């Protein structure tokens, strides 16, 4: 017997039981995006490798260790996208969407990073991202944070996420801070772990992200990024904080929050949760005003964020399972007897015409009434419609509530009205 071929480690199949959980969450996210005026853009999952090296930064964990990069048959270096912002900017430049224009775009789909698979973090994972181009003020930063806060309310998880906020200033301010931080860390090289030693010269701000308790203790006395902020960045951040205060958005200023991609400037933020065990990031983003020009476009202000859907689904499951569907179908249509199958199919189509959102499954494959009722239970139906030979002849249908056992017989042309009442 041939050996079974299995999915690649860290790249998962999402079975019907999984997609049933994802679909209502995705629908809620998209509805909120539409209410803020965002438009969908669909992007390739494969891009030229230089795009990510230029955008993310060559001296980052993503580029150095995590990207899936390969040569195609023409010898071109291609990469499975590890994140969505770079591709969105590339598309905006290529199609003339960004020059002297305001754009609000969103995308959703798989991303790829070669990391150690663990709960909520996989090598193929899914993100929803949103990007705003052409607006420079703190007001749009505040609005995208308010939009994410609305998501948490809609999904019923607002009490389980907290907002962390920081400003990393301009490129020049970060360069000055970088020098000060390196000078400080050099005094304690013997206390740094291997990862921090590597980052100290290549990307020292990433040392601030270290989870090593000994390094965290060292950083308590390190220079603070806020001490090096330029005046414009400080004013921008103060304006953002005032707007969030006025909107009632609770946040914590975390001066060690820097984000792992080189293109960020000024505002950076993360929504984090502790409801899945150790603290994890659910949604993160910030401002990247230099990226469009860096990738060949005209200088364009930009801000955006991305959210990991795997972790979001886990969080909704953990703290608000009532948001998720408990059954696959609402109504199961049972038919048994001579000539009942075609009548059942006609009735099913009539009901779908009358009730477009009704989840109705018709029994196929025969079987007596007992077996068909068992199938209705298996699919989680609330109501069974029963057509026997007598119902077909009389133009009626039996409507049975499976939880209570109550049933009534109505004319087939009245079935839609009754179902709408019973299902609420």
Swiss-Prot record:
Coiled coil: none annotated. Its main location: cytoplasm. Keywords: Aminoacyl-tRNA synthetase, ATP-binding, Cytoplasm, Ligase, Nucleotide-binding, Protein biosynthesis. The keyword DNA-binding does not apply. It catalyses: tRNA(His) + L-histidine + ATP = L-histidyl-tRNA(His) + AMP + diphosphate + H(+). GO terms for biological process: histidyl-tRNA aminoacylation. SUPFAM superfamilies: Class II aaRS ABD-related, Class II aaRS and biotin synthetases. The keyword Ligase applies. CDD domains: HisRS-like_core (cd00773), HisRS_anticodon (cd00859). Pfam families: HGTP_anticodon, tRNA-synt_His. One of its GO terms (cellular component) is cytoplasm. GO terms for molecular function: ATP binding; histidine-tRNA ligase activity. PROSITE patterns: AA_TRNA_LIGASE_II. Its EC number is 6.1.1.21. It is found in: Cytoplasm. Homodimer. HAMAP family: His_tRNA_synth. Belongs to the class-II aminoacyl-tRNA synthetase family. This is Histidine--tRNA ligase. It comes from Edwardsiella ictaluri (strain 93-146).
